[in-house]
Structures are given as structure tokens and as C-alpha cells.
Amino acid sequence: MILFSPKEIKDIEELVKEREGSVEEIEVIKLNETPNISQFLVFIKTSEVPHYHAEHDLTFTVLKGKGELYLEGEKKKLKEGDWAFIPKGAVHFYRNTSELSVLLAIFSPSYDGKDSVRVEL
């Protein structure tokens, strides 16, 4: 699987192979960014903490592995090829249930990590 953009072509499978053995908890790699959108590879070996994004919508697909998405009090099992949409303000977290989950995450507008607000459940 490749990711083609005006700046470069990235081999996503190769990026995953390079990183999968060294991930301890969660690792994030920025793939592309404009003022309107940003794309990340997210490696999750454990679990995210419950949080929401005050100013960003998030769409992600599971490229590898499987896990559970907790979204606004609902739990849904996800596997490779599944997609999720998380609107801004929605409390959520992903919990890996395999050796490693790899997600392709797309934020709109572009995400800088500053609006991730942790919550207690």
C-alpha cells in the first residue's frame, strides 16, 4: 500500500514493518499536513486514555490488528479494514486487543495535538 502526495510517495507497509517491533505503547508518525487536514500513522500496543478533540473531527481506518473503540459510551469491536468517524467533542479512546494495531488517522482541520482533552470515565 502506498500513499501518494505531491511531495513524495510513502510505502505504508514498509513504514509499518520498520516500526512495529519497537513500539512500546503508542507511537505516532505524521504523514501529510495542510491547513485543512493532517494524516498520521498511529501504532497502538496498549490503549489510549479517554479524551475528546475540541476543534477537530477524526476519521480513521484500521490498517493492521484489531481493537475496541469506545465512543460516547458505546463500545464497538474493529478489525482491519474498518473505519470510524469521531466528530469534534465526542469522548473516545481505542484499546488494542491484538499484538499491535496500526491506524491511519485523518484530522480536519490540521491537528497539532493541543486540543486533546483527557476525561475520566
UniProtKB/Swiss-Prot annotation:
Domain of life: Bacteria
Domain Cupin type-2: 47-101
Pfam families named among the record's database cross-references: Cupin_2
InterPro entries in alphabetical order: Cupin_2, Flavonoid_dioxygenase-like, RmlC-like_jellyroll, RmlC_Cupin_sf
Protein name as it appears in the record: Uncharacterized protein aq_1978
Species assigned in the record: Aquifex aeolicus (strain VF5)
